[in-house]
């Protein structure tokens, strides 16, 4: 397996980590996954801007060979630099969030130690396809982001991310007229494949706060922070 890096430093992932058990007082962890270009980093930035005055939060990004997403967040000053960390997976993006999560767990430990106390950690996956999901040992709940530019067929294609994520975000709704996508069809198909799990249609261009996605994150933090 290729080596992992945390903020550019080689990371030894060849040791065992127990399955995570949630304990009182630890930060809520929300995973954000989805294909390349769907708007994951833009959503992370929007959530940070909206929540940084009410919650103590940090962000952990995953990229294959670079720290591009973390660098973007730092350049835009969505949080202080010490609250943003990056894992370089060195291989398939879903490996580090599902199969061998050690580098992410260790980076989370570092964020917690450097920024006590934290209420929320957002964990962004590297760009992957519709099959990417997070390990339950890494996060509490997960958001999967797709975008309208792929056409209104995307939700009905399903896949683990679209079907089983705790929140499906259909992003870039402002592009629907340009690509001939029917938002009503996308919502209908999402509701059918997701069997009651929530779906949020957003446009960060038209609503930079991320609207329903922001409300969902706030609710998850409230609920999960009370679970001991």
UniProtKB/Swiss-Prot annotation:
Subcellular location: Cytoplasm
Pfam family, one: cobW
GO-annotated biological processes: urea catabolic process
Keyword vocabulary terms for this entry: Chaperone, Cytoplasm, GTP-binding, Nickel insertion, Nucleotide-binding
UniProt-listed InterPro entries: CobW/HypB/UreG_nucleotide-bd, P-loop_NTPase, UreG
Keyword Nucleotide-binding among record annotations: yes
Top-rank taxon, per record: Bacteria
Sequence positions that bind GTP: 34-41
Gene Ontology molecular-function annotations: GTP binding; GTPase activity; nickel cation binding
GO cellular component assignments: cytoplasm
Gene3D superfamilies with a match to the protein in the record: P-loop containing nucleotide triphosphate hydrolases
Main localization, broad class: cytoplasm
Protein family membership: Belongs to the SIMIBI class G3E GTPase family. UreG subfamily.
Quaternary data: Homodimer. UreD, UreF and UreG form a complex that acts as a GTP-hydrolysis-dependent molecular chaperone, activating the urease apoprotein by helping to assemble the nickel containing metallocenter of UreC. The UreE protein probably delivers the nickel.
Function description: Facilitates the functional incorporation of the urease nickel metallocenter. This process requires GTP hydrolysis, probably effectuated by UreG.
UniProt xrefs under HAMAP family: UreG
Protein name: Urease accessory protein UreG
This protein's encoding gene: ureG
């Amino acid at each position: 397996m290729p080596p992992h890096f945390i903020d550019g430093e080689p990371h030894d992932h060849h040791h065992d980590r127990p399955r995570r058990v949630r304990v009182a007082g630890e930060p809520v962890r929300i995973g954000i996954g989805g294909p390349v270009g769907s708007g994951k980093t833009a959503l992370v930035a929007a959530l940070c801007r909206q929540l940084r005055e009410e919650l103590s939060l940090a962000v952990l990004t995953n990229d294959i060979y670079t720290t591009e997403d973390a660098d973007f967040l730092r350049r835009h000053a969505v949080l202080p630099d010490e609250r943003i960390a990056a894992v370089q997976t060195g291989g398939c993006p879903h490996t580090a969030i599902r199969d061998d999560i050690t580098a992410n767990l260790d980076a989370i430990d570092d964020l917690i130690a450097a920024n006590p106390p934290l209420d929320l950690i957002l964990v962004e996956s590297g760009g992957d396809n519709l099959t990417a999901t997070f390990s339950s040992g890494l996060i509490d709940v997960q958001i999967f982001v797709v975008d309208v530019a792929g056409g209104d067929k995307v939700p009905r294609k399903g896949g683990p991310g679209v079907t089983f994520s705790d929140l499906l975000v259909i992003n870039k709704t402002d592009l629907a007229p340009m690509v001939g996508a029917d938002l009503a069809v996308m919502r209908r198909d999402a509701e059918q494949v997701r069997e009651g799990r929530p779906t949020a249609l957003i446009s960060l261009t038209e609503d930079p706060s991320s609207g329903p996605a922001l409300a969902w994150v706030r609710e998850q933090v409230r609920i999960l922070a009370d679970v001991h």
